[in-house]
Amino acid sequence: MRRFDTLFSQLQQKQQGAFVPFVTLCDPNLAQSFEIIQTLVENGADALELGFPFSDPMLDGPVIQAANQRALVAGCSTDASFQLLTQVRSTYPTLPISLLLCANLVYAQGIERFYQRCAEVGVDAVLIADLPLFAHREFTVMAEKYSIQQVFICPPNACEDTIKRVAQQTQGYTYLVSRSGVTGVENQQSADNLKTLVERLKAYQAPPILQGFGISQPQQVSDVLKIGVNGAISGSATVQIIEKYHHDPQACLAELAQFTQKMKQATT
């Protein structure tokens, strides 16, 4: 059984939701990034969603854009990101790991080579934020070849056909976006139709649903679980802690530990 499948099965038995933090690899630098990831996992993160530093990220608000810049200024490269992933996987052999990135980064490596490298370092799933449903085939063919689960986004304004196609094509989990726009904790509003979207996705037997965008408080985690999703992804709120404390590594790790514990507690 694949790692995400195993995770959701275990959480269902425990009657828990998943808490999945997002961070940018190598933010603020390679060494601190690994310590940050360790802290997240050791304090309750059920899985990780990780980004590769990129100069023009899609969907990212100012907080995650700044994280990309910190990593790039520190000299992080795609090779360094894969190196860090190797270290994470060797430390946590059962941890589900998903990548969230842009198509241009994949193209820069070559599609097949990118998925091959993902498989070599133990990545479980890949979500390409700017990959349209109608243009996914060359990516999903390579994902299947290297046993990588290709994840797709269900937007809040999805029509019935889009909901059906997302449910049928996404693997590992379904990424449900809380609202339109870019990531960020400033806008914590959610679309009014999310409960209906969850019901429709489940009607088409979509993989477990993780909701993301604007989730920064434990109460929000509890609230999204009540509408039937299987877990919550928190990116900007997690990265904001790194932004605030990256010059004080110990304070950064302490704040991240406390944040992760509270967010995970809200899934029970």
UniProtKB/Swiss-Prot annotation:
Molecular function GO terms recorded: tryptophan synthase activity
Keywords from the UniProt entry: Amino-acid biosynthesis, Aromatic amino acid biosynthesis, Lyase, Tryptophan biosynthesis
Residues forming the catalytic site: 49 (proton acceptor), 60 (proton acceptor)
Pathway info: Amino-acid biosynthesis; L-tryptophan biosynthesis; L-tryptophan from chorismate: step 5/5
GO CC annotations on file: cytosol
CDD domains: Tryptophan_synthase_alpha
Database matches in Pfam families: Trp_syntA
InterPro entries, per database record: Aldolase_TIM, RibuloseP-bd_barrel, Trp_synthase_alpha_AS, Trp_synthase_suA
Coiled-coil features, chain-numbered ranges: none
Catalysed reactions listed for this entry: (1S,2R)-1-C-(indol-3-yl)glycerol 3-phosphate + L-serine = D-glyceraldehyde 3-phosphate + L-tryptophan + H2O
EC numbers: 4.2.1.20
Keyword RNA-binding: no
Functional note: The alpha subunit is responsible for the aldol cleavage of indoleglycerol phosphate to indole and glyceraldehyde 3-phosphate.
Family: Belongs to the TrpA family.
Quaternary context: Tetramer of two alpha and two beta chains.
Protein name, per record: Tryptophan synthase alpha chain
Native species: Pasteurella multocida (strain Pm70)
